[in-house]
Amino acid sequence: MANKTALMGQKKRIALIAHDHNKPDLLEWVRFNRGTLLKHELYATKTTGRILEKELDCKITIFESGPLGGDQQIGARIAEGAIDFLIFFWDPLSPLPHDPDVKALLRVAVVWNVPIACNRASADFLIMSPLMSQEYPRILPDYEGYSKRLTTK
């Protein structure tokens, strides 16, 4: 499979999601990284977004709550190339009714080579990378052949 690139701008488009048990940890991480985060476009699911909007005192594009389709809305934006980063503090110890949505979101992020941070340590490494403040040519698999596999004769 061939590759192509998608240019991430200096201003990244970052999705922030946290399960209920992880919201305090994400909030603490956001407070610590406020200055850096405010240089970028932020997106979030509903409850997380409302909390973070109040904390950061900035506009965040807010989708539905995760269990009501918000995870899938963010996944769709990733597939469209409209989100560059996924910061998703999810709870590995609590079964959730929307576990399939979580798996689908993580899968779509991997398919489109979107950086994912699932805990504070990985989020710290991503946000502190020197690549955060510069353009970055993200390598993407070229799925054109895959998309046409059943339609060509």
Predicted segments with their positions:
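Histidine-anchored nucleotide/phosphate-binding helix
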Residues: 24-35
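Short, acidic/small-residue loops that bind anionic groups at enzyme active sites
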Residues: 105-126
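Short, glycine-/small-residue-rich phosphate/pyrophosphate-handling segment
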Residues: 121-153
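Short internal beta-strands
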Residues: 39-48
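Mid-chain, well-packed structural core segment of small domains
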Residues: 71-111
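Short hydrophobic/aromatic-enriched beta-strand-loop microsegments
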Residues: 41, 58-69, 137-140
